[in-house]
Amino acid sequence: MPRSLKKGPFIEGKLEKRILDMNSREEKKVVKTWARSSMISPDFVGHTVAVHNGKTHVPVYISENMVGHKLGEFAPTRTYRGHAGGKAEKGGSAPKRK
């Protein structure tokens, strides 16, 4: 269920303050954050935010089409290493029927 319009989007105060300070000084630094639930606002465009995925910080460059999404959407928390090799990779499966 989406957030109420009455409340407005959630953006962590510390993160928003750091981005606005960098905009006023025209700086481009990587900003580390653990706030995966923060919504991306238009002020963030052009900055790189390092979002924590539970193990490391994943650098995410913010572009215009990311506005309105949450930071956590761009830093996956799970790694997929593929299914077990088994017989399928070795070619040991039964021949196809016609």
From Swiss-Prot:
Top-level taxon: Bacteria
GO MF annotations, alphabetized: rRNA binding; structural constituent of ribosome
Stretches for region Disordered: 77-98
Swiss-Prot/TrEMBL keywords: Ribonucleoprotein, Ribosomal protein, RNA-binding, rRNA-binding
Tagged with keyword Heme: no
SUPFAM superfamilies recorded: Ribosomal protein S19
Annotated Gene Ontology cellular component terms: cytoplasm; small ribosomal subunit
Membrane spanning stretches: none
GO annotation, biological process: ribosomal small subunit assembly; translation
Disulfide-bond pairs as recorded: none
Entries under InterPro entries matching the protein: Ribosomal_uS19 (IPR002222), Ribosomal_uS19_bac-type (IPR005732), Ribosomal_uS19_CS (IPR020934), Ribosomal_uS19_SF (IPR023575)
Pfam families: Ribosomal_S19 (PF00203)
Biological function: Protein S19 forms a complex with S13 that binds strongly to the 16S ribosomal RNA.
Family: Belongs to the universal ribosomal protein uS19 family.
PANTHER family attached to this UniProt entry: RIBOSOMAL PROTEIN S19P FAMILY MEMBER, SMALL RIBOSOMAL SUBUNIT PROTEIN US19M
Protein name (record): Small ribosomal subunit protein uS19
Organism: Prosthecochloris aestuarii (strain DSM 271 / SK 413)
Gene: rpsS
